[in-house]
Amino acid sequence: MITPDGFFRVCDSVAEEIAEALRPIVGTPYGAEEICIGADNTPTERLDKIAEDIVLAAFREHAVCARLLSEEAGMVDIGGDAGIAYLDPVDGSFNASVGIPFYALSVGLSDGTQMIAGYVRNLATGETFTAVRGGGAFVDGCPIRPSEKESFSTSAMSVYARPPEMRALLENGYTSRRIRKLGASALELCYVACGRLEAFLDLRGTLRITDAAAAILILEEAGGIVSLPTGGPCIFPDDVCAGRCILGANKAIHGKIASLMRLL
């Protein structure tokens, strides 16, 4: 299986090619056109398919791993001798489709038992988050850590919840200085990893392993905690149709959010 450094080099090359290919069609009806139904049973937009095809071609050329799981193509053979990659070719497809510059290539690499490398690049800005298991997390090569804020009153959090869930949160005392919902979960988890947000909470039950694999490793390697909203282990199956609820937060505030969630 490819080394983490080799994996990052391929991802860098792929990300540059994707950004160039998408640039003329981001924010256009052509790029946003739904052209097929993906393996996750949701519509695939043209820009997703273009990005996925670029990744598949490059990963096969470099034999990055044995298999790759993508929400568009499902599980496909790559040709390497070991390992599984988890791909979201355009995390934040809606943002890309309407021209909001917050969408990313997200790729996690597993040795078959655990994630060993994660790569998330904002395709609009080029900012790149990476992590290697046991080696820390980085943005554009600089080490990152979560914030140490522990009070809801001073924290900024990304929260995805339907009206009944949000109502229950508020009725049980949830407050936050700022709530953000930016539309690209991998990038938002990375924002927790580098201290721009204190927490990411998704209660919809729709987040899949392809959405989160890379960013979870990045957040954990940075020093944050990822769990179910109530604090238990969050385990994703290799199934693009199976979603989970998730809490990713700095260590100081994670327990407080999990305690609140157990009241719901």
Predicted regions and their residues:
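General beta-strand structural signal in soluble alpha/beta enzymes
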Residues: 67-71, 87, 96, 180-183, ...
